Amino acid sequence: MEQNGFLKFKLALILVLAYFTASTILQWLFILQYQLSTLPKGFYDDQFEAVAEAFRQNFEKGLEREGAHLTIIQNGKVVVNLWNGYSDSESLREWTQNTKTILFSTTKAIAALCLAIQVDRGRLSYDDLVVKYWPKYGQYGKHLTTIEDVLTHKLFHLYHALTFGWLVDGIFRRVDEKGRSIKTFLQEEIADKYGIGITVGLTKQEFKNLARITQPGLLEYARDILMDLRVITMLAIIYAQPSNSLAARIRIHSSWLLLNFVKIYFFENDTVALNDPNIIELNMPAITGISDAFNLAKLFSLAIDGTLLTNRTLKQIIQPTIVNWHLEKVFLYPFVKGRGFFFEKHPLNRNSYLFGHPGYGCQALDIDFDNKLVIAYLSNGLKTGSSKICKTYQSILRSLYRSL
């Protein structure tokens, strides 16, 4: 009996040692391959020196294999604006102040903001039925769907990764006084008016400043799993579901939107269709937002300082509408949502929330209304998970709240 217990102890010890050995080896491999010791460019207030150090360490430790841009605005003042790395590592093209990248699902926050402006102007209400503005939408049993149902992905209880943008845009065109799309409204009423360099879709002429997207390889998946075991849960939810499940059918994109093919080689990244200018220029208000971190943060700073929205509407969007337990049919996780935004419990005040929207590969937007903070983090070397479990962004977020 004692011998069996000793053998189990030895086996457990071997497994623990193997875990830490594999984790350490993989981390050192990535440091050797991707370590970038150059100092980030830009500036930061002295109060946020720890944030700047966390950003630098992401490159020093090989966690950022391409480039990244971080901007934090507090009370309308830019307190951190840093960038580093490459917009295209294959050609050694450095990330600059003007480099932009695709936002992926962080684009949804922009679509939600544009619709909130229409709510603010009295053009619609979140509780309105969609058919009030779009009668044909009501076919096939959708006649009782509200605007809020669409924004919080309650329609069929699943996350609408791509169709969210087209659904919200369809509503938007029908309530806008000029019948404009979100793309056109954003350009005419926000970007041009306030000097914000942010678009939905990108013209081929502007493509020169766009960062090239790369995907993680299998060894990077392995490293991220060993560094944070929540990652394997996320991957299992996405990849281990039956082939006829909603998650599997959504994951298997057509070739024009290939996102999830991973090469087995350590030094190579896979083909990403969203590097194609013909795809990038499409009006897809769920994923083809184009910006840098500075302009993304500036946009939402204007949203919470009263420039774009009145307090009446702000009060509606800073609190979630879905907080109870529910089974989300794609990710099988009860995300807290509301008005088109995703919410996380506030790091310092458990009665409040951060709101914004994560994006595929660690694109991040978080808004702290209590402290009048906007945090935008964008990169082109996509990570295994979203910003909610992404080590590079989470280390920055922890450093930020230790600095307040």
Residue map of PLM features:
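Terminal signal-anchor or tail-anchor transmembrane helices
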Residues: 2-33
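Short, conserved catalytic-motif segment at the N-terminal edge
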Residues: 42-104, 123-128, 139
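Non-transmembrane alpha-helical segments in soluble domains
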Residues: 52, 56, 116, 130-131, ...
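Active-site SXXK
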Residues: 52-58, 76, 100-127, 168-172, ...
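Active-site helix/loop module of the DD-peptidase/beta-lactamase fold
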Residues: 105-106, 120-154, 174-244, 266-267, ...
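Active-site-proximal alpha-helical segments within enzyme catalytic domains
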Residues: 153, 163-171, 283, 287-309, ...
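Active-site Gly/Thr loop motif
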Residues: 215-293, 319-374
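Short, gly/Ser/Thr-rich active-site loops of penicillin-recognizing serine hydrolases
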Residues: 284, 305, 318-328, 385-404
